[in-house]
Amino acid sequence: MKPVVALVGRPNVGKSTLFNRLTQTRDAIVADFAGLTRDRHYGNGRLGKHEFIVIDTGGFEPDAGSGIYKEMAKQTRQAVAEADVVIFVVDAREGLSAQDHDIANELRRLGKPCVLAANKAEGMHDGTKLVDFYELGFGDVHGVSAAHGQGMRDLVELALAPLNLPDPDDEADEDDVNKPIKLAVAGRPNVGKSTLINTWLGEERLVAFDLPGTTRDAISVPFERNGQRFELIDTAGLRRKGKVFEAIEKFSVVKTLQAIESASVVLLLLDATQGVTDQDAHIAGYILESGRAVVIAINKWDAVDSYQREQIQRQIETRLPFLKFASLHFISAIKRQGLGPVWQAIAQAHKSATRKMSTPVLTRLLLEAVQFQSPKRAGMFRPKLRYAHQGGMNPPVIIIHGNSLEHVTEAYKRFLEGRFRKEFDLVGTPLRIQFKSSQNPFADKDD
């Protein structure tokens, strides 16, 4: 198993920058505002042959007594509990603070191995500015610069050294079959994304707080159900323009879209009390454009009456007609109602998105469809469809070869899609059909 390293420290000491450096990503939002990271944020790090999991935490204030900061402190304690080792991050430029002492006392109480990293130490060659940090009682102080990549290798080697890690070459690679299904939970702010994942996980790992957009970043966590492994991704949701922290929220939009791109299946979560909004339609459109398998869940179904239920079902038909292939589920995340069928739909959507289709079967279905209903003539030419093969998965792509295929109508494409979907039981996934014509336009001229 990969060792787990938690990054802990007061707000704005550069934990997210260090996280990004260790994982070689931009997964954590970085900007000059205190308190940006409010949930535990997981990423994969690597040092030489050794891989490890890094947890980025919110700014730790052990004595926070109320509101979101209390929740952040709770998240940090849970991260330390999950970790094999803690990197305690302090700010070399600002120097030692009373808050650093409070965190040090809390870390000693929690009892995990700890390495002290003084971040923002670029240019401090003599180390005299780091002397005060020895008061914290964690031994050597390691000056690093996450922004410039200085001291990273030494820091990680020191953190991993006590763990006596086995040689990764001695461990067998995991079979592709056992790789987790990546599931993104996407939707507007405050539709219940974090509440749903928390219900599934049985712990409050994501901060589900009564503020629109509380989860600002895409958070990924492992999960298992009925023997199937999943990686659940809660996204920040898409914000209207003009909200607070606009620069951060714009970056979060990018992370939401990247989460959709990286997922195998997307659960599109709508709010029954608000109906289908323009933002919902935009998110749905992006999911379709990305080619991801999708399941639609209407949350807070218990909070609306029968008239509102009819209204939202009509709205889905009229505003999201391009997601007809997706199954629709009515749930209450907070009351745990209707969640079982959602899992079945997710599994079915993933199976459909990764379905393998043989060339002989595809070609047989194509020729049977043409025999049942020929494509319409376009001027002198009638499209001739000759054979088909699979061109990709997730989404499934079917490539049809023949002559004058540029004249195939949209209606006929929908007809073919319906035949293929029925034969292969493709539910919850887009199906892309591509046409490749012969170079000789006269080869298919009707006599």
From Swiss-Prot:
GO biological process: ribosome biogenesis
GO molecular function, one term: GTP binding
Annotated positions binding GTP 2: 187-194, 234-238, 299-302
Tree of life domain: Bacteria
Keyword set, alphabetical order: GTP-binding, Nucleotide-binding, Repeat, Ribosome biogenesis
Residue ranges annotated for the KH-like domain, each copy included: 355-439
Tagged with keyword Repeat: yes
Similarity comment: Belongs to the TRAFAC class TrmE-Era-EngA-EngB-Septin-like GTPase superfamily. EngA (Der) GTPase family.
Cross-referenced HAMAP family: GTPase_Der
Subunit structure: Associates with the 50S ribosomal subunit.
Protein name listed in UniProt: GTPase Der
Organism per entry: Variovorax paradoxus (strain S110)
Gene symbol of the encoding locus: der
